[in-house]
Amino acid sequence: MNLLQNRILNITEEFRRGTFTQRCSQLSFGILCLFLLECSITGGGRYWEVGPVSIRILLGGLAAVLALPELFRHLGAYLKKPAVWLTLAFVAWLAFCAWRGVRAENRMDVLITDIKGFMWLFLVPVSVAVVRSRDRLRTLLSWVLAGALIQAALILAVNAAVVLMDDPAPLCRWLNEHTVGIVDVVSARLVRVFFKSSPYMIVGCVVALFRQARAPKLRWRYVLAVALLFNALLLSYTRSLYGALGLTALISIIAVLVLCPEGRKRTLAFLLAAVVCFGVLVTVQEFALEGSYLSFAVSRTIGKEVPTSWASQLRSQLRGEDPGDSPNNGEMDSQRSYIEVTEKSDQLRQETKDSLNVYIQRSPIIGCGLGASAANRDKGVDEYFYLDMLARTGVVGLLLYMLPFGYVVVWCLRRRELLRECPEGAAVVCGLCTFWIVTWFN
């Protein structure tokens, strides 16, 4: 406690003695941490709004405004950074595509949504300006990890609450209406809980993995953290998240083994311990809430019914039930119906692809402008981000969008020795891979 108080006093004194620009930079960084914490927890961030302004827009705007003194102070140097001027080039192309969308009389509501969707780009210059040290980067990642763990705990709590409550409809409705996430009651014992911030839980796993790799011994807090995140991701029953988790894990594990060779054995022990703890956690849940989570996750992923998981079978044996007894017919019928809905969703996705391909073929190089939307989507939500980009901004727009991240990856590959000293940078790159993979389907 005294250590924490001393740390707060030191930060306060440092802030008091700093110049105006330094103070603004410190405040911007602090608000940026809160911004990412909020992003890591609350989905669309619309649980509190005043008109068009949400808490997320407020925090992001404050972080950007307070970063301006630092940006203007070294504007020439920042503009020479490829990540910054490549981002500015993409913003300029977006403005051109917005003009094309207005001229082509594309859907104005979709066009406005497109513009809002790219407002996060302001984070690039803000981060470049205020995250200028390894300590700040590490602190920022700590806030992301904390937010991911809070989100995971909330998902487990919502899952249990919906199963145990007599009338979970108000809770589900509130979460859906405020775009925190999707809560679908699959059956009496199974609930799909998908928060829109779920990709941050994969980023949390990456952060924990890299920190464990640098630790002198096995850190059980990281093991339990990853097990909790795995459990929450399982309850999403979302194929894109499962795929993103698998591919990001592969990339991150390879990066850790290359950059931190001295910690390879601890890393492998960490992964094994995390999987075991995840299995124990899921087993306890299946016993307590009587749901077969693992088998339904596999069923929804492959689109076919599979036998109940080993945890459910063990539960039946311990309760003295006949292992050969068939599961509750009503329960299984509900699960089958949900899998059928998934199949219909796949058909809708294929129709969306076909509709977007029409736009792409019409103008593959420069796109058809912002606001171009698949005809079979009344709300304009197309789900396929990269096809959206090709349809609306063309090949030029997609390349400009990918270039800043591509530059960062190349920069990291050419400076592997530096990353060995600062693995947080590699953690950021691996974490960004999560969003690249998830947005392929969403």
Show the residue positions of the predicted features.
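Long extracytoplasmic/lumenal interhelical loops at the membrane interface
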Residues: N329-V396
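Loop-to-helix entry and N-terminal half of a specific, functionally important transmembrane alpha helix
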Residues: G30-E38, W220, L224-L229, W411-N442
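Membrane helix-loop boundary segments at the extracytoplasmic
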Residues: L36-V50, L235, Y384-T393, E424-N442
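Transmembrane signal-anchor hairpin modules in multi-pass inner-membrane enzymes, especially those
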Residues: M1-A98, V102, D135-R138, S142, ...
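A membrane-periplasm/extracellular boundary helix in multi-pass inner-membrane enzymes
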Residues: V256-E340, V358-R362
